[in-house]
């Protein structure tokens, strides 16, 4: 008997099941909260977490309903997977803030992990934009190179601009990804400093770790948002069909408002507005500041959930498609292998840059290049391959919603350069393109070449001795044939050979015409 999750009608019962589960949770949680509220001494702290709990109960169903609708209509995994991750931001923030508000002693631990999710959200928003552009423009790098040069915007307007094309795309991705690395590192550092009693959250001063970590996080976050903004400015017209402004504001406001209001509350503590004179049921003024931050976030997330519901709506993805199983959809939602691939690729690329190695490009038949390509990889595929193929939602969950890599063309010169860079200098001398290399030329082509030599006397000197640079690619093809004698001739070399044959044929035709004309003149009395 097949699993119920794999039946085609799972979309019918999953939504009523969620409603039933949430109703049961309400019936159990509300009486417990009321009983605890009456048992405890009713003070400012108790009232704050009770009011925040009401907003939490209103926020969770709005967010979960939007997530569930995307899973039910999971027809475009490359776009919907990052959207689902962004939608999870609201319930994670709400639950985390409420738990920290109820139990202030563990606030430092839950709040730091909550802030880590900020970087994850910004990263997924970048994935969403790049995947959409790659689906619409399979050769995104070439499309960027054709656009006018974009200068930096404030506050980096004085810096040299990034070259349009691969450099701009890579650096914008790198700017976003660096925050996903910096933020977890600072989070672990904050936990260690708290254990060592040198963190001192909410207190501005050069004697604690909190001040330095806040400055580092702020700089990293600002640069990530700057790269997102620059990326949007360059591709504003191309992104207009998905209305990115509202989506960008939803992500930016949640991240920036939560961060800067924490800084503002810390300044109130520093200025003495929040002081030890009145801490209500909290242990210190810093604990009051943390509790105030968590309380405000619980209220803000209710409005953020409503904004996310309309901004990241599931309705554009409601259409007939191959049905996937419930199990695959839920596993795809939690799959984070693309992050591992992106970070690994970035580490390799930075390592190659530091060692002075050139960028490595993938051949069209490279088995390592598939739908699991990382965010930072710019794969080199044949221009004739057409548009990127979107994986079906009915397949295995590992293929759901991974980042799509843009295509870029391959030239003989680039292949030649990559191969020669990997060959020792001693062997390069033996394989110098200037040396004579024996090539088996068909008899018919040899006849054409011999005829061409006979006609050379009628060609002007400047045309008879062309510039050697015109045949640079042919010399490189000769070297590649010497390196890979068993490999079939590339498409470019076939084109060059065809052009040579055509040129020889034209010259022979001219020679024949000249001979005929001479014959006519000789027979004319």
Swiss-Prot record:
Pfam families linked: Solute_trans_a
Q: Where is the composition biased (Low complexity)?
A: 373-388, 503-525
Which superkingdom? Eukaryota
Q: Where primarily located?
A: membrane
Membrane protein topology class? Multi-pass membrane protein
From the Swiss-Prot or TrEMBL record, state where the protein is found: Membrane
Which ranges are annotated Polar residues under compositional bias? 483-502
Q: Which InterPro entries match?
A: Ostalpha/TMEM184C
Q: Where are the transmembrane segments?
A: 17-37, 48-68, 83-103, 121-141, 212-232, 254-274, 287-307
Q: So what does this one do?
A: Possible tumor suppressor which may play a role in cell growth.
Q: Which family does it belong to?
A: Belongs to the TMEM184 family.
Q: What name appears for this protein in its UniProt entry? A: Transmembrane protein 184C
Organism of provenance: Mus musculus (Mouse)
